[in-house]
């Protein structure tokens, strides 16, 4: 079952050359990117004592806005995207900046099942895919036992409709009009329900809000609009028993 939304792909293909233009269609992502990177690294360091050999998977990597900064800090990153033009843009940037990133034009469904990662990242992607339940299940399938995942998306609330669509797209023009579809926004409780029968636990929910007075973005406990979800993959009791055998 494919997660690809062809309409969404066409929309992003038109602007895929512009990922690294801080004043372009992805400008808002550049403005929040330092927060996203800091949050990811904070959770990685919180969970792992040794981060030197971690394998990271960035799903729906776009032009490499997450993969590149992580690679620049020494992380081993594999980044995938369904769009060839996104991978081309990301690869060109990596080559220009002497970054080693394993970019692949593929989808989470097509990724080999036995490819497991210490950290799986999927930011601002879920609200653009089809078959979201299967997409999320495929996503967490690639987390190593005792590994973690960090995802972000937009809550389906009246406040999110107001700020995520009306204000962001039509008043302030932070993103192009029709970037988002309110019906595809996802409540945290819906993700929790999808993960109910898995060995994935939600470790933290954290909001990302815009402070109008200071003209800056910051992390918050307000998850009514944008939010991060920090996930952990539990090791089952059988695995623990096997690993404890001398």
Curated annotation (Swiss-Prot):
EC numbers: 2.1.1.222, 2.1.1.64
GO biological process: methylation
GO MF term set: 2-polyprenyl-6-hydroxyphenol methylase activity; 3-demethylubiquinol 3-O-methyltransferase activity; polyprenyldihydroxybenzoate methyltransferase activity
Annotated catalysed reactions: a 3-demethylubiquinol + S-adenosyl-L-methionine = a ubiquinol + S-adenosyl-L-homocysteine + H(+); a 3-(all-trans-polyprenyl)benzene-1,2-diol + S-adenosyl-L-methionine = a 2-methoxy-6-(all-trans-polyprenyl)phenol + S-adenosyl-L-homocysteine + H(+)
Keyword terms of this UniProt record: Methyltransferase, S-adenosyl-L-methionine, Transferase, Ubiquinone biosynthesis
InterPro entries: SAM-dependent_MTases_sf (IPR029063), UbiG_MeTrfase (IPR010233)
UniProt cross-references to Pfam families, sorted A to Z: Methyltransf_23
Leading EC class: transferase
Annotated pathway: Cofactor biosynthesis; ubiquinone biosynthesis
UniProt keyword annotation of S-adenosyl-L-methionine present: yes
Binding site for S-adenosyl-L-methionine: 36, 60, 81, 123
Role, per record: O-methyltransferase that catalyzes the 2 O-methylation steps in the ubiquinone biosynthetic pathway.
Similarity field: Belongs to the methyltransferase superfamily. UbiG/COQ3 family.
Listed name of the protein: Ubiquinone biosynthesis O-methyltransferase
Natural source organism: Rickettsia typhi (strain ATCC VR-144 / Wilmington)
Lineage summary: Bacteria, Pseudomonadati, Pseudomonadota, Alphaproteobacteria, Rickettsiales
């Amino acid at each position: 079952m494919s997660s690809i939304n062809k309409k969404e792909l066409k929309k992003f293909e038109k602007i895929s050359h512009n990922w690294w233009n801080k004043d372009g269609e992805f400008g808002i992502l550049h403005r929040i990117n330092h927060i996203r990177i800091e949050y990811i690294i904070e959770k990685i360091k919180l969970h792992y004592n040794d981060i030197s050999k971690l394998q990271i998977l960035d799903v729906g990597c776009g032009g490499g806005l997450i993969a590149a900064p992580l690679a620049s800090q020494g992380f081993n990153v594999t980044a995938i995207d369904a769009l060839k033009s996104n991978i081309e843009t990301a690869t060109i940037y990596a080559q220009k900046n002497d970054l080693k990133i394993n970019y692949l034009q593929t989808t989470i469904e097509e990724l080999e099942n036995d490819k497991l990662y210490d950290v799986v990242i999927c930011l601002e992607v879920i609200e653009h895919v089809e078959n979201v339940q299967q997409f999320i299940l495929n996503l967490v399938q690639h987390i190593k036992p005792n590994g973690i995942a960090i995802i972000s998306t937009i809550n389906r609330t009246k406040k999110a409709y107001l700020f995520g669509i009306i204000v962001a797209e039509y008043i302030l023009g932070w993103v192009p009009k029709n970037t988002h579809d309110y019906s595809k926004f996802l409540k945290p409780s819906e993700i929790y329900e999808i993960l109910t029968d898995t060995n994935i636990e939600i470790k933290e929910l954290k909001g990302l809000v815009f402070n109008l007075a200071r003209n800056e973005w910051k992390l918050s406990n307000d998850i009514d609009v944008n939010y991060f979800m920090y996930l952990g993959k539990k090791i089952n009791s059988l695995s623990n028993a096997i690993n404890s055998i001398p």
